[in-house]
């Protein structure tokens, strides 16, 4: 377990020394929070509080989910996934294409955790209508976060 600098009790579990130096993950967290507050605000610091105690468990392998929802809210069974929220403070994330955080599902999973911290539900059906919380703005924010991180070649 590696502590993430600037985020009091945040940590990551990495499968090897190449997956991801703590300063890269910290930069991703800063970018996420900057964009979150720009898009949605955080007047009660619920999202900042979540980032202070989150644990990211990085993995080199994708997983198969027995059930879940696509980004547009359609249910699926037995599909490869690249990230999953496992509790209020724990998320599992596949290391990403080309071994880059910007090519992983980290920002996507942080949105789920932020929604859970802010509204009490992680909104598993994303832009679907079964659960509320996730909107197209959240999806747009993720794209902007990834683009910002890509500018650092991460």
Where are these regions (language model features)?
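A metal-dependent hydrolase signature that marks the N-terminal structural subdomain at the beginning
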Residues: 1-99
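Post-HEXXH active-site segment of zinc metalloproteases
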Residues: 99-104, 116-154
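Short active-site segment of divalent metal-dependent hydrolases/proteases
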Residues: 107, 111-115
């Amino acid at each position: 377990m590696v502590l993430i600098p600037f985020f009091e009790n945040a940590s990551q579990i990495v499968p090897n020394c190449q997956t991801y130096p703590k300063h890269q993950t910290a930069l991703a967290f800063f970018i996420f929070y900057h964009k979150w507050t720009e898009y949605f605000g955080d007047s009660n610091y619920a999202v900042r509080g979540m980032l202070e105690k989150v644990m990211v468990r990085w993995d080199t392998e994708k997983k198969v989910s027995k059930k879940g929802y696509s980004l547009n809210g359609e249910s699926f069974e037995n599909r490869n996934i690249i990230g999953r929220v496992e509790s209020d403070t724990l998320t599992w994330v596949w290391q990403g294409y080309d071994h880059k955080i910007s090519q992983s599902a980290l920002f996507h999973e942080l949105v789920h955790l932020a929604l859970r911290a802010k509204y009490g539900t992680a909104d598993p059906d994303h832009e679907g209508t079964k659960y509320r919380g996730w909107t197209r703005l959240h999806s747009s924010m993720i794209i902007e976060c990834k683009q910002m991180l890509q500018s650092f070649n991460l």
